[in-house]
Design a protein with these regions (language model features):
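Function-critical hydrophobic alpha-helical transmembrane segments in multi-pass membrane proteins
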Residues: 127-187
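Functionally important transmembrane alpha-helices
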Residues: 169-221
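N-terminal, membrane-interfacial amphipathic/helix-forming hydrophobic leader that caps
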Residues: 1-94, 102, 108-121, 213
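Hydrophobic alpha-helical transmembrane segments
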Residues: 15-20, 56, 94-98, 139-143, ...
Length: 221
C-alpha cells in the first residue's frame, strides 16, 4: 500500500506517534464500553454471569474505540478517509490472502504443538472472563471477531499505525515495529490472568507472530 506524499519523519518520532496511536485506541475503548456497564452493572462484578446481550454489546463497543481513535487521528492530521485503503485485492493479492490465511493457520498449529510439547504455561486473555463456559457466547465471539475485531484492528494497526511507520522505515521494519506495538498493548490483558512472567510471554509471542503475518499480508496487498 502506498502512503500519501509526505515528508519522511525520523524513526524515533514516528515510533512514538505510532505508540501514541495504539495507546489512544486503548484509551478510547475504555470509554466506548461504558454504556454496556450501565446496561448491566454485573459486567463489573461478575462478567460471566452478566446477560448475553450486555456481554455482546461490551465486546463490540470495545473495538469501536479503535475506529474512533483512528478517525480522530485522520481528521486531526488532515489525512482524511482517503488515507484508508479500502479495495478488493487483485488476483495476485488474493493469492497473498490465501497464503496469509494458510501461514497463520500453520503458525498457530506449530505454536500449539510447541506449547503442549514443552508444557509451557499460557495465560488466558481478559476476554475469557466475559465468555466463561458459555458455548453460545463462544459462537457469538467468533462473529464479533470476524465482523468487528478484525476490521477494527486492521483499520487502526495496519491502515494507520503501520502506514504511519512507513514515513521512517522500510516496509519490513514497519511491519515488525507495528507488530511489536500490537503485542505490547496486549500485555496487560494477559498479565492479569498469568501466574508467571512466562505465562504472559507465551501468548504475547503468539500475538506478535500472528501480527507479523497479517502485517506482511497487508504490505503485500
Amino acid at each position: 500500500m502506498e502512503t500519501p506524499p509526505r515528508h519522511r519523519d525520523g524513526p524515533v518520532r514516528t515510533t512514538l506517534v505510532a505508540i501514541g496511536l495504539a495507546a489512544f485506541g486503548i484509551l478510547a475503548s475504555q470509554f466506548t464500553v461504558l454504556p454496556a456497564f450501565v446496561l448491566d452493572p454485573a459486567l463489573a462484578t461478575a462478567p460471566a454471569d452478566a446477560s448475553l446481550v450486555s456481554r455482546t454489546v461490551l465486546l463490540i463497543l470495545n473495538f469501536l474505540g479503535f475506529v474512533i481513535a483512528g478517525g480522530i487521528y485522520l481528521a486531526g492530521t488532515d489525512r482524511g478517509w482517503s488515507y484508508v485503503d479500502v479495495r478488493l485485492p487483485s488476483k495476485r493479492g488474493w493469492l497473498y490472502v490465501l497464503a496469509g490465511i494458510l501461514g497463520s493457520f500453520v503458525f498457530y498449529v506449530l505454536v500449539t504443538l510447541i506449547v503442549q510439547t514443552l508444557a509451557l504455561p499460557s495465560a488466558e486473555n481478559q476476554v475469557s472472563m466475559y465468555i466463561g463456559n458459555d458455548q453460545t457466547m463462544v459462537l457469538i465471539m467468533i462473529g464479533i471477531v470476524f465482523f468487528f475485531n478484525a476490521p477494527a484492528e486492521e483499520f487502526l494497526f495496519r491502515n494507520i499505525v503501520q502506514k504511519r511507520l512507513y514515513a521512517a522505515f522500510d516496509r519490513l521494519t514497519a511491519v515488525v515495529v507495528a507488530s511489536a506495538i500490537f503485542a505490547l498493548i496486549h500485555i496487560l490483558s494477559y498479565a492479569l490472568f498469568a501466574d508467571s512472567l512466562l505465562a504472559t510471554l507465551v501468548p504475547i509471542t503468539v500475538v506478535f507472530g500472528g501480527s507479523i503475518i497479517f502485517g506482511l499480508l497487508y504490505a503485500k496487498t
